[in-house]
Amino acid sequence: MKQYLDLLRRILDEGVRKEDRTGTGTISVFGHQMCFDLEEGFPLLTTKRLHLKSIIYELLWFLRGDTNVHYLQEHGVRIWNEWADENGDLGPIYGYQWRSWPDYRGGHIDQMQEVLRQLREEPDSRRIIVCSWNVGQLADMHLPPCHCFMQFYVADGRLSLQLYQRSADSFLGIPFNIASYALLLQMIAHVTGLKPGRFVHTLGDAHIYLNHLEQVQLQLSREPRALPRMVLNPEVSDLFDFRYEDFRLEGYDPHPHIAGVVAV
């Protein structure tokens, strides 16, 4: 995960001080790209331990089209609690846009199903895209999408995915996002008969919050370790049939967890 540590170093070396909506303050750079080849291992950060359970359940929650935190809470995942209303609702965020994007005719488009169809029928298409940035519904979202646009690409039997992320909390959020979209890539490759290729992560405003600077320095002092391997249940053939028990992580030997307060 040298690419990730290089991002942190670049922000510290080149970043500018900026104010933000949370009032915390950041050091920020604009425009950065990382690339992870899944043949080299599953890109789960090793310079601090990550809570894989939260990553998996959040992704399954998105794929369900769910926008209420009750499903997450039932499984001990609390990462969205701060933005939910008293009923647990978050508005038309990721899951809704992925599975139920409103169309011009009064219906809805299941973007994930369309991706699966295109990969099977039109793998060379340049339109295999999922977008979460629905301008007409941003005001109803409790948190507008940070990771908002993905495109799939097939070459030589390998599936790659590029993600554009407009806002990148580089200490807390980015490690989760890397693992989540790498896992989504692996899952979609699995059910479409392709091999997982590269996850390309393109960042807009990549920042470190000022209250995370000590944690970042600690992380940069640690030597990265070998990447683990993610094994999927070979019996699962439908993307929406995956359950938590269908994922097995092998060889994960990270440094200890580093705590940080999320900026809300």
Swiss-Prot record:
Pathway: Pyrimidine metabolism; dTTP biosynthesis
Gene Ontology CC annotation, any one: cytosol
Keywords: Cytoplasm, Methyltransferase, Nucleotide biosynthesis, Transferase
HAMAP family xrefs: Thymidy_synth_bact
Organism: Porphyromonas gingivalis (strain ATCC BAA-308 / W83)
Quaternary structure and interacting proteins, as annotated: Homodimer.
Gene Ontology terms: biological process: dTMP biosynthetic process; dTTP biosynthetic process; methylation
Subcellular location: Cytoplasm
Superkingdom of this protein's organism: Bacteria
A Gene Ontology molecular function term of the record: thymidylate synthase activity
General function of this protein: Catalyzes the reductive methylation of 2'-deoxyuridine-5'-monophosphate (dUMP) to 2'-deoxythymidine-5'-monophosphate (dTMP) while utilizing 5,10-methylenetetrahydrofolate (mTHF) as the methyl donor and reductant in the reaction, yielding dihydrofolate (DHF) as a by-product. This enzymatic reaction provides an intracellular de novo source of dTMP, an essential precursor for DNA biosynthesis.
Stored PROSITE patterns: THYMIDYLATE_SYNTHASE
Alphabetized Pfam families for the sequence: Thymidylat_synt
Gene3D superfamilies with a match to the protein in the record: Thymidylate synthase/dCMP hydroxymethylase domain (3.30.572.10)
Binding positions (dUMP): R21, R126, R127, R166, S167, A168, D169, N177, H207, I208, Y209
Residues of the active site: C146 (nucleophile)
UniProt catalytic activity: dUMP + (6R)-5,10-methylene-5,6,7,8-tetrahydrofolate = 7,8-dihydrofolate + dTMP
Binding site for (6R)-5,10-methylene-5,6,7,8-tetrahydrofolate: H51, D169, A263
UniProt family annotation: Belongs to the thymidylate synthase family. Bacterial-type ThyA subfamily.
Enzyme Commission no: 2.1.1.45
Keyword Hydrolase: no
Keyword RNA-binding among record annotations: no
Protein known as: Thymidylate synthase
